[in-house]
Amino acid sequence: MRLNIHKYLFIGRNKADFFSASRELGVVEFISKKCFITTEQGHRFVECLKVFDHLEAEYSLEALEFVKDESVSVEDIVSEVLTLNKEIKGLLETVKALRKEIVRVKPLGAFSSSEIAELSRKTGISLRFFYRTHKDNEDLEEDSPNVFYLSTAYNFDYYLVLGVVDLPRDRYTEIEAPRSVNELQVDLANLQREIRNRSDRLCDLYAYRREVLRGLCNYDNEQRLHQAKECCEDLFDGKVFAVAGWVIVDRIKELQSLCNRYQIYMERVPVDPDETIPTYLENKGVGMMGEDLVQIYDTPAYSDKDPSTWVFFAFVLFFSMIVNDAGYGLLFLMSSLLFSWKFRRKMKFSKHLSRMLKMTAILGLGCICWGTTTTSFFGMSFSKTSVFREYSMTHVLALKKAEYYLQMRPKAYKELTNEYPSLKAIRDPKAFLLATEIGSAGIESRYVVYDKFIDNILMELALFIGVVHLSLGMLRYLRYRYSGIGWILFMVSAYLYVPIYLGTVSLIHYLFHVPYELGGQIGYYGMFGGIGLAVVLAMIQRSWRGVEEIISVIQVFSDVLSYLRIYALGLAGAMMGATFNQMGARLPMLLGSIVILLGHSVNIILSIMGGVIHGLRLNFIEWYHYSFDGGGRPLRPLRKIVCSEDAEASGIHLDNNSIV
């Protein structure tokens, strides 16, 4: 639900107490033209907590439990953590370079660089290293008495040269080796020891995570309070302050009581033309989960109705239809229950995690329900006469369609019987629906009517849901766009007429018993009437510019057809699941099980991606086009940030105003 926001002016003397009390109440966003940036101190707190999070992921909690020194300040802890982390990163870069150097000089073998330098100083004889490209049929030893073969590695031959030897430059390349591999390995061990010592110290400092987190909360609260005070304008040599702010209307009485307590004058003022009224949404349950989805795309404008609940239920439906498998839904539900049990402690203090797991469970239930109606379970094929399929929604609709065909004998029935003459003699709807085609060698190959009916029903359901979804959006936005009445009439009329134009039978005929010919005629004239009504209503609302509304017919038509993606993605997922099952069945049990497991894993990932992307897209693109302005900004009232550790100790449930 979107709550109304009004602009108020506050005038008074007691600035400090007023802002502190306003922060506790949390219903006012004070208006300022100043731009505030994140300070270096706040950034240091965040970086320190990131280091602690990395330690928590790398080590067990038992390894991070150490005795704390209560005399250490938070600032000293943060400084030491950041210094140690910086040093560790520098040492790791040195280790990386050292490993590369070890690989480079390893073929030269172990030697003492100091002894070589001493030998060169006393005798004047230099020792140098060379390498050349290795060739299988070439002798490794050189004829020169001062050239010694060392080793072959990385497809190169390595040599030691004493003194000055004239080697062919086109074949031999000198390699610099100021230090040997054994000396570098000693340096590497020393560096790793230093890294380990610093890492151990970081683990010791992890015990102060709660203090650092509390320090960040306190610092952030002080910064927010300071920024709110900076919004004020001082009057009468600083004796009086004045500040404007956006206020949640439902909390006006509480704010008025606060102002009376601190002798603050409060008056509603008009909104400036260039100001954008912030949007404040307040939801619970599924509405809050829908709000999380809405915030992914855009913040509703102040003039918009809250679409959270609508978006949530539509997303669950679209996601379930796209995944189109009860088995996958069962996995989603079980995963949600498993993670809910594993993170049950965190869920008490993290509303976001709790809502995400609940949404996963609801999506799993939706997939189970829709997969049951379409008899889809891990891509397995059920017999057309099985009880599981007989009571499914698609089977019931297909049977009603068969009854309509035999009773009314429409044009589509005649085309079907001309293609399969054996169907003419069948009078029982169930036998007609389950009629099979006789292939070569007298083998029944497929159900010619059943398969065709099921595909048509699923495709039409996607279009039907699209018409209903868009119509609901237009009805919600009717006060801002009168032409929506005309376009609703156009879509409903088109749904009546198109089956007649295509010579097929629709849900509205065999399920809602709409007369075939009469419905088509009404739909034909209703389409033109809907377009005309949309243009007339647009002209009433927008004067002569409403004539442009006529070109929206293409947009409306394409938006309805866009819902076919639900059918296409659901069909693709079902076909992939069935294909992996068939592939696995042809292989030995172990190999076939691996193929089926990997295949369904890939299909689940693709189904989730398709369900999330296209399930949200149909809401954010097609539906929002007729029921959403967007471009708003969320209300950010001055509120006190609650540290998760403090909330845990006091039993407070965290919301958006918390740092975990």
From Swiss-Prot:
This is V-type ATP synthase subunit I. InterPro entries: V-ATPase_116kDa_su. It is found in: Cell membrane. The chain crosses the membrane at residues 312-332, 362-382, 453-473, 485-505, 520-540, 560-580, 593-613. GO terms for cellular component: plasma membrane; proton-transporting V-type ATPase, V0 domain; vacuolar proton-transporting V-type ATPase complex. It comes from Chlamydia pneumoniae. NCBIfam families: PRK05771.2-5. Belongs to the V-ATPase 116 kDa subunit family. It is a multi-pass membrane protein. The lineage of its organism: Bacteria, Pseudomonadati, Chlamydiota, Chlamydiia, Chlamydiales. Produces ATP from ADP in the presence of a proton gradient across the membrane.
